[in-house]
A protein has these predicted regions:
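Glycine-rich anion-binding surface patch
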Residues: 1-175
Length: 175
């Protein structure tokens, strides 16, 4: 295991530019791959476990995305973490409804997401509400990306949860 980092809890494969180019993001530039590699190494993120993604559409700059599970797994290991609730905000008829989870019917519109993160010793949870309009991933033509079109509730719930985790634990998640 020459250049591999292995621990009881986390296995890190050897990552290099060729591996990233071949298996993760063939369209990425050398600079984008280098930055992605450095982030993965510094944060101990394994892209093969979907802890980090390098995403590139057309000629736009690549985007580095840290997977939601990375945040929830790491939060669970923090001594002050006491749980979370997260859900979506839907327009149901003429009413705004806050719903836990990501379920909604075809007659409802997902407007946003919300999350609360509970921290031991803190009376009030860290709470965020986010708008789909602000965060929805879009293609060059302005239409939603496949994930946002197919899993709108799940995606906006993740955004709200990650924001709340970052605010609750800025030292662990970089604010």
């Amino acid at each position: 295991m020459s250049n591999e980092i292995a621990t009881k809890e986390h296995y890190m494969p050897e990552l290099n530019a060729d591996i990233i180019k071949k298996y993760i993001c063939p369209a990425a530039t050398e600079q984008e791959i280098y930055i992605f590699l450095q982030l993965c190494k510094a944060q101990r993120l394994n892209p093969f476990l979907r802890e980090a993604y390098l995403v590139k559409y057309g000629n736009s700059p690549a985007t580095i995305v840290t997977g939601k599970e990375t945040f929830t797994k790491r939060a669970a290991s923090l001594p002050d973490f006491s749980g979370f609730k997260a859900g979506i905000i839907v327009l149901s008829g003429d009413k705004i409804v806050y719903r836990e989870g990501a379920f909604y019917t075809s007659s409802e519109s997902v407007m946003g997401g919300w999350a609360e993160v509970y921290v031991k010793g803190r009376a009030v949870p860290y709470r965020n509400e986010v708008s789909v309009e602000e965060y929805e991933g879009k293609k060059a033509d302005g239409s939603p990306t496949k994930m946002w079109a197919e899993k709108r509730g799940t995606m906006i719930r993740k955004v709200a949860l990650v924001q709340s985790l970052r605010e609750a634990f800025p030292d662990a998640f970089g604010g």
